[in-house]
Structures are given as structure tokens and as C-alpha cells.
Amino acid sequence: MSKTISFKTYSAKPGEVERKWYVVDAEGKVLGRLASEIATILRGKHKPQFTPHVDTGDFVIVTNAGKIGLSGKKLDQKTYFSHSNYPGGVKIENLKDMLRKKPEKVIEKAVWGMLPHNNLGRALFKKLKVYAGPEHPHVSQSPVEMKVNQ
């Protein structure tokens, strides 16, 4: 008798997804490479049960956001653009000022650009926790240290 092989595609259901917590130390890491690794974990693409239309990702805590590494002349040349939708409401801020004022925002903007820009992407983004210093208040979730390759 021959074996029966199931050719059905597996689709994860929101209730059966198990979520883990990861902590990443951003000190000295290159911004774009770190952001792409974080986006992969948030999306759940590292899991075999990844389903594109279901939130299968894990939580990510990023510490030492103020000590992120950058390549080239990005510290002086990279700018962030925003507009308030009012006439003359353009706000342009360079990376050096943003790292000084709110270093968490730099990593958040980099990761947000790598997530889908829809309802699912907004739900995924809520699972990202970024802190400027080495401390974070999520010790009770017992996060696992995540190694990011340089």
C-alpha cells in the first residue's frame, strides 16, 4: 500500500500562533541591516508556518538605539521629511539631530519602511519596542537574546 501525501497548503490561524519575545542590542549595528532583520522577525518570516495575511510574527525589543552604527556620510546627509498637510508645514530633520533628540524614532522609521503599509503592517509595528538606553521594562516576558550578523 502506498503512502498518502497531503498536498494542501497550510494556512496559520491567528489563534494558534505562538509568540516569543526577542531582545536586540543595537550598539554598533548598521541601521539598515538591523532593521531588515527586525522586520523579518516582526513579520514571522523566520517561522515555517508563515502566512502572508496573518500576523505570525514575534515581539522585538531594541536597546541602545542611541548607539546605532551608520556607514558612509549618512550622519550628516540623511534627512527625514514630514509634512503637516498645512501650507508651509514641511519639516525636514537630518539624522544627526534626530539621533540626539529621539534616537528611538530612527530605528522605528527604518523598520516601518520595511513592513507592509496596511492594517497588518500597523499591527506588526505595535510589536516593536525601542529604547534609547540599555534598560527595558519587559523583563517579565523573559526575552531571548537575538544575535544579528553585521
From Swiss-Prot:
The UniProt entry's GO biological process terms, in alphabetical order, are: negative regulation of translation; translation
Gene Ontology cellular-component terms for this entry are: cytosolic large ribosomal subunit
Keywords attached to this Swiss-Prot or TrEMBL record, sorted alphabetically, are: Ribonucleoprotein, Ribosomal protein
> What CDD domains does this protein map onto?
Ribosomal_L13 (cd00392)
Q: What does this protein do?
A: This protein is one of the early assembly proteins of the 50S ribosomal subunit, although it is not seen to bind rRNA by itself. It is important during the early stages of 50S assembly.
- NCBIfam families assigned to the protein according to its UniProt record, in alphabetical order: rplM_bact
Q: Which HAMAP family match?
A: Ribosomal_uL13 (MF_01366)
Question: What is the protein's quaternary organization?
Answer: Part of the 50S ribosomal subunit.
The name on file for this protein is: Large ribosomal subunit protein uL13
The scientific name of the source species is Chlorobium phaeobacteroides (strain BS1)
Gene that specifies this protein: rplM
